[in-house]
């Protein structure tokens, strides 16, 4: 299986506009295969600079927030998304409205 370039994942995060989210699969697809979603998740969990590489903007394919968000858990991810103007209900975002 192709190896994913960690920096390419992090660079992708910096291009997500304020008020928008992406899914793990969208990043995987950008890297060449939607099935890379799990590897993308592992890379994001190892992110050491949440301000420089805003992984809070990544949600599941159903719009669900990450219970294991690396920088403070699901409540912190929710707070950051709401600060960007993204409405969160029941720990999910409306992908029809907010997907980049």
Question: What are these regions, as identified by a protein language model?
Answer:
Residues 1-100:
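Nucleic acid-binding interface residues in structured DNA/RNA-binding domains
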